[in-house]
């Protein structure tokens, strides 16, 4: 598999797996993070993904893991600013797609960001929804 050369969008499932040793994707997420660090790959995300990640880590892992994400991983991220037009577009995507597929509103926002603002860059996610939306997904 050819990995991204210079930039990638990161989803909650990727961040969660990278910090939770009990997650089945923990080792793969760690390998991908190391690859990005070694190859200067820019990690893009949104505040919505950060919020979802911190919440998931707090409830499914623990407080310290959530803070570790905020203190160590978040500073290394390029956070894409999302205005109301992104959220309005995400509402349309959610209403169109989520009836037949289990798509969260956060994932709808990510889809709009990736396709309209980031020129369809690849994604690091373990969430099958991204692939079903036609996005390029690793791993």
Regions found by a protein language model. Name each.
Residues 1-44, 58-68:
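Short, well-structured N-terminal submotif of metal-dependent ribonuclease cores
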Residues 3, 79-121:
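Active-site neighborhoods of divalent-metal-dependent phosphate/nucleic-acid chemistry enzymes
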């Amino acid at each position: 598999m050819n990995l991204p050369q210079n930039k990638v969008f990161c989803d909650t499932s990727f961040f969660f797996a990278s910090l939770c040793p009990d997650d089945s994707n923990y080792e793969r997420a760690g390998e991908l993070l190391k690859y990005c660090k070694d190859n200067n790959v820019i990690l893009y995300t949104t505040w919505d993904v950060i919020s979802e990640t911190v919440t998931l880590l707090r409830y499914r892992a623990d407080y310290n893991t959530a803070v570790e994400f905020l203190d160590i991983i978040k500073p290394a991220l390029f956070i894409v600013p999302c205005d109301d037009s992104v959220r309005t577009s995400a509402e349309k995507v959610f209403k169109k797609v989520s009836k037949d597929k289990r798509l969260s509103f956060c994932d709808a926002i990510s889809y709009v960001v990736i396709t309209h603002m980031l020129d369809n860059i690849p994604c690091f996610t373990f969430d099958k929804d991204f692939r079903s939306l036609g996005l390029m997904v690793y791993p």
